Swiss-Prot record:
Keywords on record: Cytoplasm, Disulfide bond, Isomerase, Rotamase
Superkingdom to which the source organism belongs: Eukaryota
Cellular compartments annotated: Cytoplasm
Role, per record: PPIases accelerate the folding of proteins. It catalyzes the cis-trans isomerization of proline imidic peptide bonds in oligopeptides.
Residue ranges occupied by any PPIase FKBP-type domain in the UniProt entry: 19-112
GO cellular component: cytoplasm
Family annotation (InterPro entries): FKBP-type_PPIase (IPR050689), PPIase_dom_sf (IPR046357), PPIase_FKBP_dom (IPR001179)
Similarity comment: family membership: Belongs to the FKBP-type PPIase family.
Major location (coarse): cytoplasm
Catalytic activity reported: [protein]-peptidylproline (omega=180) = [protein]-peptidylproline (omega=0)
The name this protein goes by in its record: Peptidyl-prolyl cis-trans isomerase FKBP12
The organism of origin for this protein: Vicia faba (Broad bean)
Molecular-function annotations in GO: peptidyl-prolyl cis-trans isomerase activity
EC code(s) of this entry: 5.2.1.8
Length: 112
């Protein structure tokens, strides 16, 4: 599967380019294998938007590839197969089981 994108709200700006610092709001779903269960959000109390260098492998592959295909201001849901998420190791601290399909709702706030 890789990464599948469903647009929730279209963007109006340009797509990010590899190597840019991209800032996003993100909510991740798939805790304990249940795609309706949130495991993390930048919108939770005490959290802030997340910034990463796109296309450099600093985040999961689903984010690197999925966000490259998004426009500034776009909100989309990305469904990531295990090999595009946390793979065989999962992410136990967040309740992500090994080989889990995950979904992320991402809003692209900035790219520079």
């Amino acid at each position: 599967m890789g990464v599948e994108k469903q647009i929730i709200r279209a963007g109006t700006g340009p797509n990010p380019s590899r190597g840019q610092n991209v800032t996003v709001h993100c909510t991740g779903y798939g805790k304990n294998g249940d795609l309706s269960q949130k495991f993390w959000s930048t919108k939770d109390p005490g959290q802030n938007p997340f910034t990463f260098k796109i296309g450099q492998g600093s985040v999961i592959k689903g984010w690197d590839e999925g966000v490259l295909g998004m426009q500034l201001g776009e909100v989309a849901r990305l469904r990531c197969s295990p090999d595009y998420a946390y793979g065989a190791g999962g992410f136990p601290a967040w309740g992500i089981q090994p080989n889990s399909v995950l979904e992320f709702e991402i809003e692209v706030l900035r790219a520079q």
